[in-house]
């Protein structure tokens, strides 16, 4: 985000679960000035009436971030900030048949975070999946949270111009 002029991020709850993003002069609160998407699918609660993004994808799984601003963003929705698309990894960047990745963190106030991913390529098929478990008691009263996220995708490259794919996502948060 440091290379995109006028974009700023804001993390409001001390947990890193919900990241707010905005462009210059607009509110970053829950990214409500952006049309927020994941792999092209809208992930805000109500894109036209109440466009807050309560969910932010795990940043370890994000391959790239697509931002469309100005008049071109109108094709994605009415938000003033434009469109923000989190494009998750799909395994096409992994040159091995299988690769396993894990990141685990423990800290004060009962913090525990475990991110585990598997991905790879087998001929014309590439796949990627992850599971993230994040919990803490919080640094203040009533700050407890527990988040579980699972994602998997499988893609088959039929030809250089045609790819067939499947993806499944599950997110559960208690706070």
What kind of feature is each model-predicted range?
Residues 64, 71-74, 82-120, 131, ...:
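Short strand-turn segments of transmembrane beta-barrel domains in outer membranes
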Residues 8-10, 31, 43-45, 71-75, ...:
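Short beta-strands and strand-coil junctions in structured, solvent-facing domains, enriched
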Residues 2-45, 63:
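Extracytoplasmic beta-strand/coil segments of soluble accessory domains associated
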Residues 18, 52, 79-81, 97, ...:
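Transmembrane beta-barrel architecture of outer-membrane proteins
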Residues 106-135, 140-175:
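Transmembrane beta-barrel wall of Gram-negative outer-membrane proteins
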Residues 41-69:
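Short acidic/polar hinge/loop motifs at secondary-structure boundaries
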């Amino acid at each position: 985000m440091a290379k995109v002029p006028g974009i700023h991020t804001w993390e409001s709850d001390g947990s890193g679960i919900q990241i707010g993003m905005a462009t210059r002069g607009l509110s970053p609160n829950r990214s409500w000035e952006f049309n927020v998407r994941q792999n092209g699918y809208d992930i805000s609660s109500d894109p036209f009436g109440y466009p807050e993004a309560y969910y932010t994808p795990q940043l370890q799984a994000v391959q790239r971030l697509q931002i469309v601003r100005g008049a071109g963003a109108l094709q994605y929705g009415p938000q003033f900030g434009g469109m923000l698309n989190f494009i998750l990894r799909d395994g096409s960047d992994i040159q091995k048949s299988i690769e396993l990745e894990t990141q685990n963190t423990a800290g004060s106030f009962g913090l525990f975070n475990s991110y585990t991913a598997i991905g790879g390529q087998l001929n014309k098929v590439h796949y990627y999946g992850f599971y993230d478990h994040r919990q803490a008691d919080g640094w203040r009263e009533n700050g407890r949270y527990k988040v579980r996220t699972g994602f998997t995708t499988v893609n088959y490259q039929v030809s250089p111009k045609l790819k067939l794919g499947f993806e499944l996502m599950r997110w559960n948060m208690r706070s």
